[in-house]
Design a protein with these regions (language model features):
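Conserved alpha-helical scaffold flanking the Walker A/P-loop in AAA+ ATPase domains
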Residues: 26-31, 96, 100-101, 127-149, ...
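Residues at the beta-strand->loop junction immediately N-terminal to the Walker
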Residues: 43, 154-155
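Conserved D-loop-proximal element of ABC-family nucleotide-binding domains
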Residues: 162-163, 193
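Conserved catalytic/switch belt of AAA+ P-loop NTPases
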Residues: 141, 166-180
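Loop/turn-to-beta-strand initiation segments
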Residues: 146-151, 176-182
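Conserved Walker B
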Residues: 156-160, 172, 188
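Flexible beta-alpha connector loops of hexameric P-loop NTPases
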Residues: 120-130, 157, 201
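Charged, glycine-rich active-site and insertion segments that engage polyanionic ligands
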Residues: 1-60, 64-84, 88-91, 95-101, ...
Length: 371
């Protein structure tokens, strides 16, 4: 689904952010302390609002709401907790010039660093390269035109290659005055330790059911409460994940998956071939990826249950008998092998043009124990 068809705004244009009040209070407390770190590592699972939060901070700074210079976070500050704050907000009026400029990507004091376009292939790169990172140094040494702050959002820092990471590290080690760097990360543990140590870590949490329901009711007003709850549980508190699932027809796919899984270890060949056959057609690549991701997640839930010695909470009431029966079908090691196999097959399908129908059938035969 293209971004222009989305029913929800891009992070830079989003005015709605819920469930991250603790993180917001932490940043506001740092602003008032007079010791605002110049670099923030905004971390958490995908789809919970990290990039939206980064742009929320950017608007706040560019709106002239931060007084005093930024400070070097320094290695010793990485784990220190800041006092929380109550009663304030990072909200900037959506009708303001700053908000509109940030949303349009035209604010002169804001630089967004993302994966760029490969000039040779004209396709999006798979990583942020050193040329992207080098733009940051030149940008930060220019004179700010408005609030006095120059802000850089890197979304996501996980996608930087080593050369790009080293270029950003040099900036973090010697930041110019009134520079604010906001690094979005899904997996902070994989970053260079020296990058992590130069940033104030700000963890964002998956959203609770009430916050997810509020957001889904806003973005998907046509959906029932039952469907909103299904999306919430399937996405594990990720609003981005829930909206992407909805766009890909994930709810119907999950119900069909559960219908097939409920029959295991027996499989009805006609139903399996009908389900797998829908992914053969051109244009159904996203649906295939979604179905396989849902299947991998289902297997992962069973593997965790096997390790803990207790059944996972069913997402749909009708899947409980299948969970109970299948938990004893394989050992923990076998469930882990199946999880790896499904993920591996999914990754290789488009890379080497495997038959998507046969991949789905093969995955179910493996679950059955005959593949």
């Amino acid at each position: 689904m293209s971004t222009e068809d989305q029913a929800w705004p891009e992070p830079r244009a989003s005015s709605l952010l819920v469930g991250q009040e603790t993180a917001e209070a932490t940043f506001l407390a740092a602003c008032r302390s007079g010791k605002l770190p110049h670099a923030w590592l905004i971390a958490g699972p995908p789809g919970i609002g990290k990039a939206s939060f980064a742009y929320r901070i950017a608007r706040y700074a560019l709106n002239g709401s931060i007084e005093g210079p930024a400070q070097d976070a320094g290695p010793s500050l990485f784990g220190d907790a800041l006092p929380s704050s109550e009663g304030d907000s990072l909200t900037v009026d959506p009708d303001s010039i700053v908000f509109r400029q940030v949303a349009a990507g035209s604010h002169p004091d804001l630089l967004s660093v993302e994966r760029g376009i490969n000039e040779r292939t004209k396709k999006e790169r798979s990583e942020i390269v050193v040329e992207d990172a080098r733009r940051v140094a030149g940008f930060l040494h220019k004179t700010a035109s408005g609030s006095g702050w120059r802000v850089v959002v890197i979304d996501s820092v996980d996608e930087m290659n080593r050369n790009a990471a080293n270029a950003i590290l040099k900036i973090l080690e010697e930041p110019p005055a009134n520079a604010l760097l906001l690094l979005v990360s899904h997996s902070p543990g994989r970053l260079l330790p020296t990058i992590r140590s130069r940033c104030r870590l700000l963890r964002l949490s998956p959203l609770g059911e009430a916050d997810m329901d509020r957001l889904l009711a806003h973005y998907l007003p046509e959906e029932t409460g039952e469907n909103r709850l299904l999306l919430t549980r399937l996405s594990e508190g990720s609003i981005g994940g829930a909206l992407a699932l909805h766009a890909a027809g994930g709810m119907a796919l999950y119900r069909d998956l559960v219908g097939l899984l409920a029959g295991l270890p027996d499989l009805e060949a006609r139903k399996l071939h009908a389900f797998a056959g829908r992914f053969e057609r051109a244009g159904n690549e996203d649906a295939f990826q979604t179905a396989m991701a849902l299947l991998a997640d289902w297997i992962a839930r069973l593997a965790r249950a096997k390790g803990l010695g207790q059944l996972p909470q069913p997402i749909l009431a009708e899947e409980e008998p299948a969970l109970r029966r299948l938990a004893s079908l394989h050992s923990l090691d076998r469930w882990l092998e199946l999880w790896e196999k499904v993920r591996h097959l999914t990754a290789r399908t488009d890379a080497i043009n495997l038959d998507r129908k046969q991949v789905v059938i093969g995955a179910f035969l493996a679950l059955q124990g005959t593949g």
